[in-house]
């Protein structure tokens, strides 16, 4: 939560998102005996994960580190709490790990800037602006960060916010050039 904009943090962005399946997991899924065990484990893990998340939210709320909005699905976190949390993560060498999760979750949730996606984009745009100010260090995170900024720039351009669109698109292009190389952009 400490990386998002301090207001309107959607619950969906905070939950764990399953990683892509490996080839072994895909093969295991085809095995009917494995499937039965996996279904039972998945249901148990999902329930445990939901309970843990709810417990964590209650603890944070009880200590006034966060507040739950009236809709029950979005949160707020004071800037000083965000800053203190990021400092703690840095001291404990976890800052990049959590920044990567933040970028990954936000990139997965942020749609294209097409008109039909504007409501979702509008809700997530402040968080994309926050992400723009928090460039990750790891290359795998930078790819997602550049993609997020591209989608956010697209939305900003569509709604007529040229200044934000230009800034985000330039960050995205520069990052992609650094990762992919200038030849990629020259079409060669």
Model-derived segments and spans:
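C-terminal boundary/linker of central alpha/beta nucleotide-binding cores
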Residues: 1-91, 96-104
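Extended alpha-helical scaffolding segments used for macromolecular assembly and cargo binding
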Residues: 2, 99-171, 175
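Short, conserved phosphate/pyrophosphate- and ester-handling motifs at nucleotide-, phospho-/glycolipid
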Residues: 78, 181-184
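Hydrophobic alpha-helical membrane context
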Residues: 90, 173-174, 182-183
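Residue register of alpha-helical TPR repeats
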Residues: 147, 186-188
């Amino acid at each position: 939560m400490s990386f998002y904009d301090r207001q309107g943090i959607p619950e969906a962005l905070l939950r764990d998102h399953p990683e892509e399946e490996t080839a072994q997991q895909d093969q295991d899924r085809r095995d009917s005996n494995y499937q039965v065990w996996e279904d039972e484990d998945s249901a148990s893990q999902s329930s445990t994960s939901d309970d843990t998340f709810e417990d964590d939210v209650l603890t944070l709320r009880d200590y006034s580190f966060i507040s739950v909005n009236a809709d029950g699905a979005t949160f707020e976190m004071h800037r000083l709490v965000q800053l203190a949390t990021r400092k703690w993560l840095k001291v404990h060498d976890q800052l990049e790990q959590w920044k990567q999760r933040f970028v990954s979750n936000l990139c997965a949730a942020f749609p294209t800037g097409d008109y039909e996606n504007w409501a979702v984009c509008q809700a997530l745009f402040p968080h994309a602006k926050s992400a723009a100010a928090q460039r990750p260090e790891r290359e795998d995170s930078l790819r997602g960060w550049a993609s997020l900024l591209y989608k956010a720039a697209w939305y900003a351009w569509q709604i007529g916010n040229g200044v934000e669109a230009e800034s985000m698109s330039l960050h995205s292009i520069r990052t992609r050039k650094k990762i992919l190389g200038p030849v990629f952009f020259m079409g060669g």
